[in-house]
Amino acid sequence: MTKRLSPQLLIYGYAQGIFPMDEDGQIYWYDPDPRAIIPLDERFHVSSSLQRTIRRQTFEIRFDTAFRETMQACSERDETWISQEFIEIYSQLHAGGLAHSVEAWQDGEMVGGLYGVGLAGLFAGESMWSKARDASKVALVALVERLRAGGFQLLDTQFITPHLATFGAYEIPRAEYKQLLVKALQCSATF
């Protein structure tokens, strides 16, 4: 348990393979076993219906234009681990070029997106939101394309969900995750 967060503490945590969540005003650090990742190779799967949505260009995808708003939207649920303190600290990481958002826009309005932390060749996906069908899914596909182009090695999703499994996300033992993390932190990548 931690009382306060700082950008430096967050970066240290991600480099060790742990991540924070706020529960009832207390900050806890997690190191799940197993750990979920999304493959950045040919195992990443996009359904044919989602491919059609992407081809129709239903959404305009933007990167890092509404980071704070993306986090705020991710936090607006009945139960959330994203406190205002988290929004402030991650926004500081964003200002330093280490946290990023992918936003789906439609008719001038942001209708979905995601955010996460990029550290060397690691991208730790933190949360997604959507108020238009497929908006966050299209944002995830755009994220994977960007990570591939930038030389990222590891897309950490922390926990598996049925939604992420449709893209090919899978679980690996903590020890294997730590090995992949060490390799990812040794490479240079650009978001």
Curated annotation (Swiss-Prot):
Disulfide bonds: none annotated. Belongs to the L/F-transferase family. GO terms for cellular component: cytoplasm. It holds the Pfam family Leu_Phe_trans. It is an enzyme of class 2 (transferase). Its main location: cytoplasm. The keyword DNA repair does not apply. The gene is aat. The keyword Repeat does not apply. One of its GO terms (molecular function) is leucyl-tRNA--protein transferase activity. SUPFAM superfamilies: Acyl-CoA N-acyltransferases (Nat). Its EC number is 2.3.2.6. One of its GO terms (biological process) is protein catabolic process. It catalyses: N-terminal L-lysyl-[protein] + L-leucyl-tRNA(Leu) = N-terminal L-leucyl-L-lysyl-[protein] + tRNA(Leu) + H(+); N-terminal L-arginyl-[protein] + L-leucyl-tRNA(Leu) = N-terminal L-leucyl-L-arginyl-[protein] + tRNA(Leu) + H(+); L-phenylalanyl-tRNA(Phe) + an N-terminal L-alpha-aminoacyl-[protein] = an N-terminal L-phenylalanyl-L-alpha-aminoacyl-[protein] + tRNA(Phe). Keywords: Acyltransferase, Cytoplasm, Transferase. This is Leucyl/phenylalanyl-tRNA--protein transferase. Functions in the N-end rule pathway of protein degradation where it conjugates Leu, Phe and, less efficiently, Met from aminoacyl-tRNAs to the N-termini of proteins containing an N-terminal arginine or lysine. PANTHER family: LEUCYL/PHENYLALANYL-TRNA--PROTEIN TRANSFERASE, LEUCYL_PHENYLALANYL-TRNA--PROTEIN TRANSFERASE. It is found in: Cytoplasm.
